[in-house]
């Protein structure tokens, strides 16, 4: 009987969830990971694990900041955001979410046993509910409030 790699099976199931839910983000990410896994590129997994999250956050930040950099959102609009209650609330929520993300990074580093559950939950949220894969850090931050930071 041929050996079936359980990790490949998990990745295939997750890719299938991405396809079924028409979520190209999940599908593409999982297919890239599958390609890395089954080729000699698999020796780069330690690098991907170490820097992938940071690179992803940089790319996400570029996407979020692009309207300011391109001039679509002007400097005066940014300054006026401090004068409206909705914008002030958005700033406060942004601060809170960033704080939660920081707690999440700490929890994921100090309690790696929770990472698998957070990742599965995030992929399910992305695949089934059209979410975006920023969930693990925020989910870990929320989890840290419930179970403690370390």
From Swiss-Prot:
It is a multi-pass membrane protein. Belongs to the UPF0756 family. Keywords: Cell membrane, Membrane, Transmembrane, Transmembrane helix. The chain crosses the membrane at residues 1-21, 51-71, 82-102, 127-147. The lineage of its organism: Bacteria, Pseudomonadati, Pseudomonadota, Gammaproteobacteria, Enterobacterales. Pfam families: DUF441. Its main location: membrane. This is UPF0756 membrane protein PC1_1142. GO terms for cellular component: plasma membrane. It is found in: Cell membrane.
């Amino acid at each position: 009987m041929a050996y079936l790699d359980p990790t490949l099976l998990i990745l295939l199931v997750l890719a299938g969830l991405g396809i079924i839910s028409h979520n190209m983000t999940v599908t593409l990410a999982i297919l890239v990971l599958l390609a890395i896994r089954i080729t000699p590129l698999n020796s780069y997994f330690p690098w991907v694990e170490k820097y992938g999250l940071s690179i992803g956050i940089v790319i996400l930040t570029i996407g979020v900041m692009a309207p300011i950099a391109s001039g679509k959102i002007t400097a005066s609009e940014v300054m006026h955001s401090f004068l409206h209650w909705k914008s002030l609330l958005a700033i406060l929520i942004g601060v809170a979410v960033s704080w939660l993300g920081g707690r999440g990074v700490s929890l994921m580093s100090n309690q790696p046993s929770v990472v698998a559950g957070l990742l599965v939950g995030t992929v399910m949220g992305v695949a089934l509910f059209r979410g975006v894969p920023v969930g693990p850090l925020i989910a870990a931050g929320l989890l840290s409030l419930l179970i403690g930071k370390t």
